[in-house]
């Protein structure tokens, strides 16, 4: 189904008892201006523009880059979508504006250092540390283009639509027949025929066909050579001078490729990320922040998902996904507890460990040491089973800690939910 494929483009979700919650994947997401610079290196047509982090830099950019432009596009730079319809906490409406050149400096001053709230940031919003000043393009057509990874074809999948400029979900609903999918053979790479199919699906009105084919091939080259997990151009614009231009782009990169993409990963802006996820990544923990009240620490992704489901079934809401893995050290367990207790929304913590490679006594020692370092103000429910379970239970019993023990997962979830509402 088209919608199923499109759902993989920009985000995924955790299914918790039949309800979907946002999941931030372990991947690098870079700012729009950084993506434009990267695309330019591959010969991809992008608008002329420059980023500025202060009013003085804005003034210099207007003078040196846009000395004769009458209108300028001023774009707030945050790692979230929906900027155009967002609202600054200062009251300014919209994170993207087209203004007269002489007004750009004063507008940028109202954006820089302010918090922008969009449908993707949550009510806390994100701080705007830079603005991206771009030339105003004369557009004759807007299209949609994306490359993502498809499990069904076990390779890159190009998705294109002759309509663009709005969310792909809306496009899929309004114009399902206009969306095409072109799977690419990962061994052969993109061929002229593949690129031609994409161009035919985009149906540009005036752009040169061969030049358009070359642009598609360059986008695919960027996707592969940069280890992207997503390259989304919306809109892929057709300009009055008969060119295809990546007017707005979103690029995500596989975290597993950090060792060979050092230049790209140096672009990471941790100020835009959840500080809990940043701390977890440093400790080599698989953590994803959610918006519930029960903190979870589990070993194994499957068990973690099941734990979240059962919490939901008992009427609770998980505050996070946290998989400590099968070889976590005592220090990592301590760090995990620090992350869980740093969330003010957490009213109870559920530790659910099935010891295979992960030993229950290591988890127990970590819990005890964490209690010594962290002021535990919320109830902790512990369910241990598996390797060294007796040693683990003994360590917890002899610690003198006030813990709520559970015999199985269902019992643990029920007790955690009850503890969270006291």
Curated annotation (Swiss-Prot):
This is Succinate--CoA ligase [ADP-forming] subunit beta, mitochondrial. It is found in: Mitochondrion. Belongs to the succinate/malate CoA ligase beta subunit family. Succinyl-CoA synthetase functions in the citric acid cycle (TCA), coupling the hydrolysis of succinyl-CoA to the synthesis of ATP and thus represents the only step of substrate-level phosphorylation in the TCA. The beta subunit provides nucleotide specificity of the enzyme and binds the substrate succinate, while the binding sites for coenzyme A and phosphate are found in the alpha subunit. One of its GO terms (biological process) is tricarboxylic acid cycle. The keyword Aminoacyl-tRNA synthetase does not apply. ATP binds at residues 75, 82-84, 142. Its main location: mitochondrion.
């Amino acid at each position: 189904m088209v919608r199923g494929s499109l759902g993989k483009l920009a985000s995924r979700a955790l299914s918790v008892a039949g309800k979907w919650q946002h999941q931030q994947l372990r991947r690098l997401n870079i700012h729009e201006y950084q993506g434009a610079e990267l695309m330019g290196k591959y010969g991809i047509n992008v608008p002329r523009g420059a980023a500025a982090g202060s009013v003085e830099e804005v003034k210099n950019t207007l003078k040196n880059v846009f000395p004769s432009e009458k209108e300028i596009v001023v774009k707030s730079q945050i790692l979230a979508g929906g900027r155009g319809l967002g609202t600054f906490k200062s009251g300014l409406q919209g994170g993207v504006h087209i203004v007269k050149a002489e007004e750009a400096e004063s507008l940028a001053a109202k954006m820089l250092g302010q918090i922008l709230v969009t449908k993707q940031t949550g009510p806390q919003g994100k701080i705007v540390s830079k603005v991206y000043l771009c030339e105003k393009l004369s557009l004759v057509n807007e299209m949609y283009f994306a490359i993502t990874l498809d499990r069904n074809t076990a390779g890159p999948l190009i998705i294109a639509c002759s309509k663009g400029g709005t969310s792909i979900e809306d496009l899929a609903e309004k114009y399902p027949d206009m969306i095409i999918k072109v799977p690419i053979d990962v061994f052969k790479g993109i061929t002229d025929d593949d690129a031609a199919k994409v161009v035919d699906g985009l149906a540009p009105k005036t752009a040169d066909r061969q030049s358009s084919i070359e642009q598609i091939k360059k986008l695919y080259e960027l996707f592969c050579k940069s280890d992207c997990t997503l390259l989304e151009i919306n809109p892929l614009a057709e300009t009055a001078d008969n060119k295809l231009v990546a007017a707005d782009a979103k690029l995500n990169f596989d975290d597993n490729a950090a060792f060979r993409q050092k230049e790209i990963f140096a672009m990471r802006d941790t100020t835009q990320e959840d500080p809990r996820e940043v701390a977890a990544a440093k400790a080599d923990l698989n953590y994803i922040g959610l918006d519930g009240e029960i903190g979870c620490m589990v070993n194994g992704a499957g068990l973690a998902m099941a734990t979240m489901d059962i919490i939901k079934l008992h009427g609770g809401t998980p505050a996070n996904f946290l998989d400590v893995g099968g070889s976590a050290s005592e220090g990592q367990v301590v760090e995990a507890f620090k992350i869980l207790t740093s969330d003010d929304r957490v009213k109870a913590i559920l530790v659910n460990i099935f010891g295979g490679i992960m030993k229950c006594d290591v988890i127990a020692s970590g819990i005890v040491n964490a209690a010594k370092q962290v002021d535990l103000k919320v109830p902790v429910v512990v369910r241990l089973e598996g390797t060294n379970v007796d040693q683990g239970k003994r360590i917890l019993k002899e610690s003198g800690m006030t813990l709520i023990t559970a015999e199985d997962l269902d019992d643990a979830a029920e007790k955690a939910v009850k503890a969270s509402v006291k």
